[in-house]
């Protein structure tokens, strides 16, 4: 009896990396998420692997306009009262330089624009948890014929998790790079496994792309 098709295994040859909320305030600033700073070196390796393989990269950032009301409900009161978290045009909102040297175009991002920072590499602003909510992410990935969303970044239980669920709901294959994501626990990985999300390490990704490059050279 046939086991049927495999609809969930990552297809890295048709993948895009979505790096979520890796910004100075969350790495080492006043709103830091424990464990994020320690994972920046793995994130840098992951970015290098995708860049070398010429696969798409999307940096997703969170921006809170001081005093603005378009913030998620758990943080809205704090933002309205003057607290600054990843405020546009501040160092806290920037992506660490070792991950992205290009400055962010905050005004364009807040207006819903897609900022192109290098060949195959863009930045998008998301106003809530999921990178798919009120963004151009799905259209961008479809235009590039991507079928696998590889997620890494800051604080798995919040934005990476929401993004992985939304990727699955849109019939993308989905994978989480565990050593390049903060706040990973066995319980959270078990929840993701139930919706078909597979786990990878940075070394897994590097080895796949290195093997693919070697195979192509031999042809």
Predicted regions and their residues:
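Short amphipathic alpha-helices and their capping/turn segments at secondary-structure boundaries
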Residues: 2-16, 44-52
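Short glycine-enriched, charge-decorated loop/helix-capping segments at active-site entrances
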Residues: 30-37
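Active-site alpha/beta core segments
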Residues: 41-144
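A short glycine-rich beta-strand->turn/loop micro-motif centered on a GG-aromatic cluster
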Residues: 148-154, 171-186
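Short Gly/Thr/Asp-enriched flexible loops that form oxyanion-binding sites at enzyme active sites
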Residues: 160-170
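Active-site-proximal loop->helix
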Residues: 183-197
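A charged, well-structured terminal subsegment
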Residues: 198-219
């Amino acid at each position: 009896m046939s086991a049927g098709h495999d609809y969930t295994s990552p297809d890295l040859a048709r993948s895009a990396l979505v790096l979520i909320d890796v910004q100075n305030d969350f790495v080492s600033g006043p709103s830091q998420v424990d464990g994020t700073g320690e994972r920046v070196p793995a994130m840098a390796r992951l970015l290098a692997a995708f860049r070398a393989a010429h696969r798409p990269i999307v940096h997703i950032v969170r921006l809170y306009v001081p005093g603005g009301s378009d913030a998620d409900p758990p943080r809205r009161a704090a933002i309205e009262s003057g607290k600054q978290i990843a405020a546009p045009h501040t160092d806290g909102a920037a992506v660490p330089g070792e991950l992205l040297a290009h400055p962010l175009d905050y005004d364009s991002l807040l207006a819903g624009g897609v900022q192109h920072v290098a060949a195959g590499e863009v930045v998008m602003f998301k106003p809530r948890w999921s990178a798919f909510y009120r963004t151009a992410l799905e259209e961008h990935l479809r235009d590039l014929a991507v079928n696998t969303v590889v997620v890494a970044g800051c604080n798995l239980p919040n934005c990476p998790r929401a993004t992985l669920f939304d990727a699955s709901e849109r019939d993308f294959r989905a994978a989480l790079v565990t050593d390049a994501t903060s706040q990973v626990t066995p319980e959270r990985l078990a929840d993701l496994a139930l919706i078909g999300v597979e786990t990878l390490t940075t070394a897994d990704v590097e080895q796949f792309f290195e093997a693919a490059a070697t195979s192509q050279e031999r042809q």
